[in-house]
Amino acid sequence: MGSSVYIMVELAIAVLAILGNVLVCWAVWINSNLQNVTNFFVVSLAAADIAVGVLAIPFAITISTGFCAACHGCLFFACFVLVLTQSSIFSLLAIAIDRYIAIRIPLRYNGLVTGMRAKGIIAICWVLSFAIGLTPMLGWNNCSQKDENSTKTCGEGRVTCLFEDVVPMNYMVYYNFFAFVLLPLLLMLAIYLRIFLAARRQLKQMESQPLPGERTRSTLQKEVHAAKSLAIIVGLFALCWLPLHIINCFTFFCSTCQHAPPWLMYLAIILSHSNSVVNPFIYAYRIREFRQTFRKIIRTHVLRRQEPFRAGGSSAWALAAHSTEGEQVSLRLNGHPLGVWANGSAPHSGRRPNGYTLGPGGGGSTQGSPGDVELLTQEHQEGQEHPGLGDHLAQGRVGTASWSSEFAPS
């Protein structure tokens, strides 16, 4: 694989990584059903993948040219991708722990896992990622080693900017790989095994002796489907990143072995960066709520198609209604709860002059036109304030489904 082919493939990966993960963040932003603690970590993971496309891949392309630079400037370019890798690892680990709590102790989940705690954990994960990834900047590097070839080529105080020339391999193998990649991956493997074993045990218990107050079988199956989807993401992360780390281990432990050829290194680097592209496809394939929201975004904002109002659906573009009593009607517009009032008014028990009124009765309209009807955003309330989704539907309202309902099998 030549350097020009490598650069073209890397640029294609960068574009796909940016577009796909922006779509993930956009979906969570506009769809209140996706705004939950687990998806906070998903957004953090998507942010790291966006940064791979925007920064890490251009840095990797620049380093591949072997340009002359100050050693610490080159070192920053080389280490930045390690920061993003570490952030992805921590986000995946946080998601695994979140799903473990949801399945093992579901009754305590809402008390233990809150939005504020999740945001705090995400902030800590990013701080740790920068500390771990930029450790070579603090002195664990090859900048102090004199390289006569670099001095002749680039001049005094400058080096040929190549990854292995500035980042020591003992840091990459012992510190980066063994401590902060392999160990978290093994921990995630153990967590997901515990999740599936616990779910299997609970399903068998439900079949033999169902207990009052337990979750229904369908709810638990949705949780298991969610865990499988996220376990696939962890598996793909390992599949994409382990080849590059294995090559580093051979380079470090077998000094007499022939160095990996350039085409193999290019292939391993491309595979590692391609991990930033795959996650949105997994969400779209495995998670119904993400898939529907992706379609809605593409149709509405890319293809510029307006979706007509569908009863029971999650989209509405127009509403014509008239009655004699003022009453709120709740709808959802592109995933957002909405209140519909005549003339932009608050609820009113009496007949409205110069416009329509909405209510349970079937009366006619007074003066005015359908243009007087407008949609006002209504504050979304958490599930604790509502008695249940069935009650909402019975009252003509739309509630927020549980997180696991996003992962209902297609």
From Swiss-Prot:
GO CC field: asymmetric synapse; axolemma; dendrite; glutamatergic synapse; intermediate filament; membrane; neuronal cell body; plasma membrane
Chain sites annotated for binding adenosine: 164, 248, 272-273
Ranges per topology, Cytoplasmic: 30-39, 98-117, 194-229, 286-410
GO molecular function terms noted in the UniProt entry: alpha-actinin binding; calmodulin binding; enzyme binding; G protein-coupled adenosine receptor activity; identical protein binding; lipid binding; protein-containing complex binding; type 5 metabotropic glutamate receptor binding
Record's subunit section: Interacts (via cytoplasmic C-terminal domain) with USP4; the interaction is direct. May interact with DRD4. Interacts with NECAB2. Interacts (via cytoplasmic C-terminal domain) with GAS2L2; interaction enhances receptor-mediated adenylyl cyclase activity.
InterPro entries linked: Adeno_A2A_rcpt, Adenosn_rcpt, GPCR_Rhodpsn, GPCR_Rhodpsn_7TM
Comment text on domains: The cytoplasmic C-terminal domain is necessary for targeting the non-ubiquitinated form of this protein to the cell surface.
Record localization: Cell membrane
CDD domains, A to Z: 7tmA_Adenosine_R_A2A
A GO biological-process term: response to caffeine
Intrachain S-S bonds: 68-154, 71-143, 74-161, 254-257
Full protein name: Adenosine receptor A2a
Membrane-related topology note: Multi-pass membrane protein
UniProt source species: Mus musculus (Mouse)
Gene for this chain: Adora2a
One Pfam family in the UniProt entry: 7tm_1
Glycosylation sites: 142, 149
Principal localisation: membrane
Biased composition regions of type Basic and acidic residues, renumbered to the chain: 377-389
Entry keyword annotation includes Cell wall biogenesis/degradation: no
Ranges per topology, Extracellular: 1-4, 64-74, 141-168, 254-261
Transmembrane intervals: 5-29, 40-63, 75-97, 118-140, 169-193, 230-253, 262-285
